[in-house]
């Protein structure tokens, strides 16, 4: 497996750990096709609530994923009898460890910042996490539009007959 595939699968595992609503959105694609307005309404409500809670949920989800990803990788290797996906799980685990380290660094740096700046930054962080949650749910609920395959162009039934142009018939 190439490095590009390892990075792609690792990032997908990481994002599925941080945004578990992505998995639910992928499973409900067919319902969203049938009822798009209802799906959009539910999507906005869910992303508003979960996005505001992501300030607390992202550290919890990262810690949970950092603890369970090695076990999931082990179970996947036993189930498939192959170590092919271990690098992807290691990549996702490293991303979770990096996320935890950044969060710990931010918490310690917030101690030295004045309280008004902390509250403004928390408000901005909550709005960003709400937007990212909405984007992740929407991207997995409504996949990009793929036009149907085009049919080969068939000529009109009487293609060999001469059809005069408008300008030619005007001068007759």
Curated annotation (Swiss-Prot):
Quote a single Gene Ontology cellular component term: plasma membrane
- Membrane topology per the record? Multi-pass membrane protein
Which cysteines are cross-linked by disulfides? none
Q: Which domain of life is it from?
A: Bacteria
Q: Which UniProt keywords apply?
A: Cell membrane, Membrane, Transmembrane, Transmembrane helix
Compartments annotated for it: namely: Cell membrane
Q: Which family does it belong to?
A: Belongs to the chlamydial CPn_0442/CT_006/TC_0274 family.
- From the Swiss-Prot or TrEMBL record, give the protein name: Uncharacterized protein CPn_0442/CP_0311/CPj0442/CpB0458
Native organism is: Chlamydia pneumoniae
């Amino acid at each position: 497996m190439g490095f590009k595939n390892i990075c792609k699968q690792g990032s997908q595992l990481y994002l599925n750990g941080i945004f578990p609503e992505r998995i639910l959105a992928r499973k409900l694609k067919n319902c969203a096709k049938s009822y798009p307005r209802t799906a959009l309404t539910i999507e906005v409500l869910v992303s508003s609530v979960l996005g505001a809670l992501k300030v607390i949920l992202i550290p919890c989800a990262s810690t949970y994923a950092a603890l369970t990803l090695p076990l999931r990788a082990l179970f996947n290797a036993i189930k498939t009898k192959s170590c092919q996906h271990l690098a992807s799980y290691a990549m996702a685990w490293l991303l979770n460890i990096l996320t935890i380290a950044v969060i710990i660094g931010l918490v310690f740096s917030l101690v030295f910042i004045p309280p008004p700046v902390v509250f403004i930054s928390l408000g901005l962080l909550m709005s960003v996490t709400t937007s990212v949650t909405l984007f992740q749910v929407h991207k997995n609920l409504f996949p990009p539009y793929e036009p149907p395959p085009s049919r080969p162009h068939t000529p009109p039934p009487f293609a060999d007959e001469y059809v005069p142009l408008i300008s030619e018939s005007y001068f007759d």
